[in-house]
Regions:
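Bacterial N-terminal signal peptides
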Residues: 5-15
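Extracellular/periplasmic carbohydrate-active domains that bind, remodel
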Residues: 17-461
Length: 461
């Protein structure tokens, strides 16, 4: 509440002169680009601005002591081309700072950008809530050093861009729903040394264009906090994800959600005892007819407040897909992942396909995870342990999420089903308390299962 009150007072205190400066800021950007490029540097102070469009070869510098605040008038934001087709139809959304078909653009500095997200209607359609930064069809994009606060929707979105660098950025986003941290639908990307604390997904790779490949992307040395998923690929997955490496990151939930308390979501998520939790530490989700291949997530430390450390799903959310092809997932490596606290729910990790769609060549290596146990009846929400594998629904077309099966899974560590080529290598699974499910790992319809140097024996159907 203190943060919300501060934003309200902040907006009320801004002068009309600041609004007049918005036109001057856009004019300076336009003039710099027309003259071949340059740096447009804000002075120190607080500035309320309408939507800003970056142009070729322009760097917007927001120095320390400068605070740029987004207008709450959505009509003052530039329209962006409605140029892509997702399975559910065309999408469009405005952004406070945007660029489209631009080359060599940047937002840098030690200053602050405030999205005023709490002023936009909570839970209204995403089209009615602007993103904070959005780049479409751009080349050579940099976002460095800035602090991004209180977006109304996604914080930083790169769509069909080539050559993206995000370095040393701090993001805090708890003012509205769908407040992702960094959404990557781009190629040749580096994200490093960022601190992200958000309501929705912290780092999320998306593919909303069937003929564009999200590839050659690296995320490293970041600290991620989320009330949703922490490291995610999907759910939007109509194109190709290839050669993605996420490594040397820390994930934990630091901030209790003021919007979604998972203890009371639906009839309650089993075992969740705090408002300070997120869903999956690592979530890999292919459900829209795209392809995911050559993905590694490694050197990850999982701290407190993570409900499910690993969630991997291949499904049929949208079928037929945009291109009429089924989803595929292959060559996945999860390596050197260590939990420093037990999982924050009774929902086990899962690696699942559906009949006819099977993840291929998935390796978990040097993984040590801890689970809470306490799997004694009755479970929250009246749920019971599935007595038979067949009791776990396929949920082929359901939205992929750790809780999607609406049941306590038959194992307390990992439930795996419909997979070709799955290796557990030096995997250690621990219980903080006894669990009546008994088995650490349950495998159903898994071919090519190998278990080496692990502290469990899978229950195999």
């Amino acid at each position: 509440m203190r943060k919300l009150a501060f934003l309200l007072l902040f907006a009320a205190a801004l002068s009309a002169a600041c609004r007049a400066g918005a036109a001057s800021l856009q004019a300076a950007i336009d003039a710099a680009s027309a003259s071949g490029g340059g740096v447009v540097r804000l002075p120190e102070g607080r500035f309320l601005s309408d939507g800003i469009r970056l142009r070729d070869n322009v760097t917007l510098e927001i120095p320390e002591g400068s605070i740029l605040v987004a207008s709450t008038n959505l009509a003052a934001y530039a329209e962006q081309t409605e140029s892509y087709l997702a399975p559910e139809g065309r999408k469009n959304c405005k952004a406070f700072i945007c660029a489209e078909n631009a080359t060599n653009v940047a937002v840098v500095g030690k200053g602050v950008v405030v999205g005023n997200g709490c002023f936009f209607t909570v839970r209204c359609s995403v089209g009615g809530r602007p993103r904070l930064l959005r780049f479409i069809d751009c080349r050579d994009v940099r976002v460095e050093g800035v602090t991004l606060l209180a977006p109304a929707s996604w914080t930083c979105h790169f769509m069909r861009c080539d050559g993206v660098a995000v370095r040393g950025v701090k993001i805090e986003a708890h003012s509205n729903y769908n407040s992702d941290g960094i959404d990557i639908d781009a190629k040749n990307v580096i994200v490093e040394d960022c601190d992200i604390d958000v309501e929705d997904d912290a780092i999320c790779f998306k593919s909303d264009t069937a003929d564009f490949t999200v590839e050659n992307c690296e995320v490293r040395n970041c600290r991620l906090s989320s009330n949703s998923n922490f490291i995610k690929i999907g759910t939007a997955s109509v194109g190709v994800f290839r050669n993605i490496d996420v490594h040397d990151c820390e994930v934990s939930c630091k901030t209790p959600s003021g919007l979604t308390d998972w203890r009371y979501y639906a009839d309650g998520i089993p075992g969740v005892r705090s408002a300070r939790t997120g869903l999956a530490g690592i979530a890999l989700e292919m459900v829209d007819g795209g392809v995911m291949e050559n993905v590694s997530v490694r050197n990850i430390v999982i701290g407190e407040g993570v409900q499910t450390p690993v969630f991997i799903r291949l499904g049929r959310r949208h079928e037929p897909s945009v291109e009429g092809r089924p989803s595929a997932m292959r060559n996945i490596l999860v390596e050197n992942v260590r939990a420093t606290a037990p999982a924050a729910s009774l929902i086990a990790c899962s690696i699942t396909g559906v009949p006819g769609l099977r993840p291929q060549n998935v390796v978990l290596r040097n993984v040590e995870l801890s689970f809470p146990g306490e799997g004694k009846p009755p479970f929250p929400g009246g749920r019971e342990v599935s007595a038979l594998f067949g009791d776990v629904p396929e949920a082929s077309r359901e939205y992929p999420e750790n809780r999607m099966f609406a049941t306590i899974l038959p194992a307390w560590g990992f439930y795996v089903r419909h997979v070709d080529g799955l290796a557990f290598e030096n995997v250690r699974l621990h219980l903080a308390n006894p669990d009546r499910r008994g088995d650490a790992v349950a495998a159903d319809d898994v071919s090519g299962l190998t278990v080496r140097d692990c502290n469990f024996t899978p229950h195999i159907r």
